[in-house]
């Protein structure tokens, strides 16, 4: 999120094996051996969008998603933070990135959901439901 309440999304590289050239969460990745979810989140923020250790201290856990078909059988921890950029995008992973309002994301999903990685749409909808409760 930025200070205007817009969410930064990455446009996945055309070289990605799964869901190339789709909009996805700001950062994502897998645990390395011996790492916990928080440590992996920090590592991915550094690798994918170039935030340093001092900038990543503001992340906070939101919720956990159990493995399911919608997450390709992966366990997911969702974290969030506020940062206005700029970001240094990892070219091998990300072709583009920009901030979107919640309304714009909803409209884009409604009009053309295939422009998003399927797991993003699933987790986005879980997030919106949680915010309403």
Q: How does the language model describe each region?
A:
Residues 8-10, 26, 48-51, 70-71, ...:
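Short acidic/polar alpha-helix capping motifs at helix-coil junctions
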Residues 52-62:
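A short coil-to-beta-strand element that immediately follows conserved catalytic motifs
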Residues 46-54, 67, 84:
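Alpha-helix capping at helix-to-loop junctions
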Residues 3-43, 47:
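Conserved Nudix-box catalytic region and its N-terminal flanking loop in Nudix hydrolases
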Residues 21-23, 61-66, 70-133:
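Nudix hydrolase/Nudix homology domain
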Residues 1-3, 81-82:
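Active-site beta-strand termini and strand-to-loop segments that position acidic
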């Amino acid at each position: 999120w930025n200070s205007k309440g817009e969410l930064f999304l990455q446009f996945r590289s055309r070289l990605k094996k799964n869901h190339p050239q789709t909009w996805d969460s700001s950062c994502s990745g897998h645990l390395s051996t011996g790492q916990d979810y928080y440590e992996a989140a920090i590592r991915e923020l550094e690798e994918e969008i170039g935030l340093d250790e001092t900038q990543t201290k503001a992340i906070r856990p939101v919720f956990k998603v159990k493995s399911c078909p919608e997450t390709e059988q992966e366990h997911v921890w969702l974290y969030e933070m506020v940062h206005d950029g700029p970001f240094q995008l990892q070219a091998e992973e990300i072709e583009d990135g920009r901030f979107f309002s919640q309304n714009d994301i909803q409209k884009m999903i409604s009009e053309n959901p295939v422009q998003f990685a399927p797991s993003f749409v699933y987790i986005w909808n879980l997030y919106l439901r949680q915010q309403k409760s």
